[in-house]
């Protein structure tokens, strides 16, 4: 089964994915992004690749902070890109910025745990 990044388009979709991650005991990695954010566009292909590499082990979500502002505000997003890791419905880790090495390490750390 190939991986894929799930685009969150509503608070309800966000809540459903957090519940799914909790139910399946899978970590969720979220990319908080914006269409106008250059660094976000640069790291997006890596995020997509990681979703394939960790298919079945990790749930990958993408949240456009302008399209789903309520989710971004609730998550306390102040800069893009910001990556959050959720485990059992609770934020477990985060990364601010478009560092490819740090993003790879973040996903690997939580996929193995």
Swiss-Prot record:
InterPro entries per the UniProt record, alphabetical: Thioredoxin-like_sf, Thioredoxin_CS, Thioredoxin_domain
UniProt keywords, alphabetically: Cytoplasm, Disulfide bond, Electron transport, Redox-active center, Transport
Active site: 37 (nucleophile), 40 (nucleophile)
Cysteine pairings via disulfide bonds: 37-40
PROSITE patterns for this protein: THIOREDOXIN_1, THIOREDOXIN_2
GO annotations of cellular component type: cytoplasm
Subcellular location: Cytoplasm
Residues annotated as domain Thioredoxin: 2-112
Site, Deprotonates C-terminal active site Cys: residue positions: 31
Site feature location: Contributes to redox potential value: 38-39
Function statement: Participates in various redox reactions through the reversible oxidation of the active center dithiol to a disulfide. The H form is known to activate a number of cytosolic enzymes.
Miscellaneous comment text of the record: This thioredoxin cannot be used as a substrate for E.coli NADPH: thioredoxin reductase, but is a substrate of spinach ferredoxin-thioredoxin reductase and can activate NADP-MDH.
Family stated for the protein in its record: Belongs to the thioredoxin family. Plant H-type subfamily.
Name recorded for this polypeptide: Thioredoxin H-type
Species the sequence originates in: Chlamydomonas reinhardtii
Gene this chain is encoded by: TRXH
């Amino acid at each position: 089964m190939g991986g894929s990044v799930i685009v969150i388009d509503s608070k309800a979709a966000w809540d459903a994915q957090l519940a799914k991650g909790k139910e399946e005991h899978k970590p969720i990695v979220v990319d908080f992004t914006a269409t106008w954010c250059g660094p976000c566009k640069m790291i997006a292909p890596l995020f997509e690749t990681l979703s394939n590499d960790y298919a079945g082990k990790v749930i990958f979500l993408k949240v456009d902070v302008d399209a789903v502002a309520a989710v971004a505000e609730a998550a306390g997003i102040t800069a893009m890109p910001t990556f959050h890791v959720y485990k059992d419905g609770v934020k477990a880790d985060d990364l601010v910025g478009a560092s490819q090495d740090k993003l790879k390490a973040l996903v690997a750390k939580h996929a193995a745990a």
